[in-house]
Curated annotation (Swiss-Prot):
Similarity comment: family membership: Belongs to the SprT family.
Active site (UniProt): 68
GO MF terms, alphabetically ordered: zinc ion binding
Protein name in the entry: Protein SprT-like
Domain of life (superkingdom): Bacteria
Residues of the signal peptide: none
Coiled coil: none
Cofactor: Zn(2+)
InterPro entries, sorted: SprT-like_domain, SprT_Zn_ribbon, Uncharacterised_SprT-like
Compartments in which it is found: Cytoplasm
Residue span(s) of domain SprT-like: 7-147
Keywords, alphabetical: Cytoplasm, Metal-binding, Zinc
One matching Pfam family: SprT-like
């Protein structure tokens, strides 16, 4: 899917589910890493993470668009557009927009280091490097050592 198809999909979802038109731009932003999408308050544009579409398909993309359109329409109407606001919760429930999207990578896939306890042999996956002089095994309080550097 390209940005033109994404724009048309966003406009059609806005018309069908919200009964309001989407007058700004929706586009894929490959720099997004930890979020499915975001609504930009200044320009009123919607950015979508292309990795969400690649991994989870069009149904996940539609859910993300609905979520971001909730922010968009409430902000345009000068109502509560933040996640904590009652207006946002009410509208997102009405249109079936989820509060969160699925994570692109789980913790095990993101892990860069594997540590092993010298006492009990337990292994620990970590994204960031750990100071083995300070950190100990949570199970037996044994000494940790870097077993494997994955990436």
């Amino acid at each position: 899917m390209d940005n033109i198809k994404l724009q048309k999909l966003t406009e059609s979802i806005s018309e069908s589910d919200f009964g309001l038109s989407f007058k700004h731009t929706a586009y894929f932003n490959p720099r997004l890493r930890t979020t499915g999408g975001r609504y930009l308050l200044g320009s009123h544009d919607i950015e979508i993470n292309p990795k969400q579409f690649e991994k989870f398909g069009e149904t996940a993309l539609i859910d993300i668009i609905k979520h971001e359109l909730c922010h968009y329409h409430l902000h345009i109407q000068r109502k509560g557009y933040k996640h904590k606001d009652a207006d946002f919760k009410k509208l997102s429930q009405k249109v079936g927009a989820p509060r969160f999207c699925a994570a692109i990578e789980n913790y095990e896939e993101r892990a860069n280091y594997i540590y092993k306890c010298l006492g009990c042999g337990e292994t620990f996956k970590r994204i960031r490097k750990v100071n083995t002089r300070k950190m100990v095994c949570g199970k037996c309080k044994g000494k940790l050592h870097l077993h494997k550097h994955i990436k």
